[in-house]
Amino acid sequence: MAERQVNMELSNDLKNLPASGDETKIVQEVYQFIVIRLGDENFGIDINYIDNILRMQQITRVPKVPAYLKGVINLRGEVIPVMSLRIKMGLSDDEIGRDTRIIILKIGEEGNVGILVDEVREVIKLTDSQIESTVGDNVSPESRRFVSAVGQNGEQLISILDLTTINLDDN
């Protein structure tokens, strides 16, 4: 009797499965990015790399370093180098304003590094289908080597930064 009931339940379960050839829903991975502004361009930074976002504060200059390395800050007892992402990417000099922020990134063995950005705009979610791995004409030539992909957020294009290219080395 119990065997017959199990067979009936299995039969009912099988009836609910999609038939061969039926469309099945494909689950896409969702990624979160913080959208920043540098000049007239919008860039996305994977939220997993972000440790902190700070208002602009005093940066202590360090002598004999590349121009893009603005100096260091002290964050809860940790000395963190701060670089100008604009200068590193070959864009115009920084324009420090009330929206300027220092984003503390967690980058591999280098530890934490701060980057100056003109503005932190928003947090967005993008799926695989919204991210194009080829970088087109929407990214300035100076920025291309720092961009790994382009995301489509509604009508807005977001250049996704490749954080492996944003290091403290002089290249």
Predicted regions mapped to residue ranges:
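An acidic, low-aromatic, low-complexity terminal/linker signal
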Residues: 1-171
